[in-house]
Amino acid sequence: MRSRQRGAALLVVLLILALMVTIAAVITERTGKAFLRTESHLSRQQAKWYALGAETLSGQILQRDARNMPGRTFAGQNWSQPGLRFPVDGGEITGQISDARTCFNVNAINQGVDNESTLVKTPYPAQVFRLLLKNLGEETDRAEKITAAVRDWIDADNYPSANGAEDDVYAALPVPYRTANQRMSEISELRSVYGIDSDLYRRLLPYVCALPVDAMSININTLTEFDAPLLSAVFLNEMTMSQAKALVQQRPRMGWASLEVLQQTGLLPPNSKNTAQRVLAVKSEWFFVKLQVRVGDSDFHQRSLLHLSGQKVQVVQRQYGGYRTVNP
């Protein structure tokens, strides 16, 4: 009898011990996970503050360059240095400032250069966008349809233009949605426009942007040879892409001081004076700041849009996480 009691007691002790070990293991696991979550959260918060500091520094660099050379913005200034890296406690910041006047602003597509687009059947910016598509390999018919669809996406009405697409087209899709009928707040919206697939989006992405203004302006002093398809389209393809590359190659090291100086070079197409004066610029006021911060094992991405007005820099937009992604 006593032997059985001892066996039962031993079994109870073993069960209690097993239960205690299980509870201890669960507590240890949960504590470890909580610690990792806390550590990850703290690293992300630290990385965010580093990014905001780098953003402020970027604005100061732009201000300094503007003070040193108030009349122009050109490749070779401090802001344009590629692959900037800054070591910080526990990690590293990498960043790049880019001129937002080296891309086609899709929000200008419905506007004439002087906001008189309502008087024009096909506004000049829409012609530029259509020719940019052609320069990137699109057929004329598809380029016209996509241009019309982008115009309908942004315009305020629900009346489709010729070859365009409004709510009725999007409502018939397998996953229906509606047009924005307002400015694009981010260039990734372009992927939602009818007719723009992932392949075209990838090809367009380096040449387009979405700025919070309706004006179209291209800084001739910061374009690269890669931007030849856009520069050619700006002159309605009266300038070939080879000529556009040659124009960039012959640009002075500190850029052109004014459009008048550029026009005197003879590098522009004949009868292009009006286009140059209305669209081209030698100075920029919009800049993208792309930042990546690594703290420990955490990566933090931030993309900011800065507006430089005189000596004042304003942060107009911030995006955290991934940016300029391509959906399937």
Curated annotation (Swiss-Prot):
Its main location: membrane. Residues 1-7 form a propeptide. The chain crosses the membrane at residues 8-28. InterPro entries: GspK, GspK_central_sf, Pilin-like, T2SSK_SAM-like_1st, T2SSK_SAM-like_2nd. The keyword 4Fe-4S does not apply. It is found in: Cell inner membrane. GO terms for biological process: protein secretion. Keywords: Cell inner membrane, Cell membrane, Membrane, Protein transport, Transmembrane, Transmembrane helix, Transport. GO terms for cellular component: plasma membrane. Pfam families: T2SSK, T2SSK_1st. Cleaved by prepilin peptidase. Residues 29-328 are periplasmic. Type II secretion is composed of four main components: the outer membrane complex, the inner membrane complex, the cytoplasmic secretion ATPase and the periplasm-spanning pseudopilus. Interacts with core component OutG. Component of the type II secretion system required for the energy-dependent secretion of extracellular factors such as proteases and toxins from the periplasm. Plays a role in pseudopilus assembly and seems to control its length. Interacts with the pseudopilus tip complex that is critical for the recognition and binding of secretion substrates. Belongs to the GSP K family. This is Type II secretion system protein K. It comes from Pectobacterium carotovorum subsp. carotovorum.
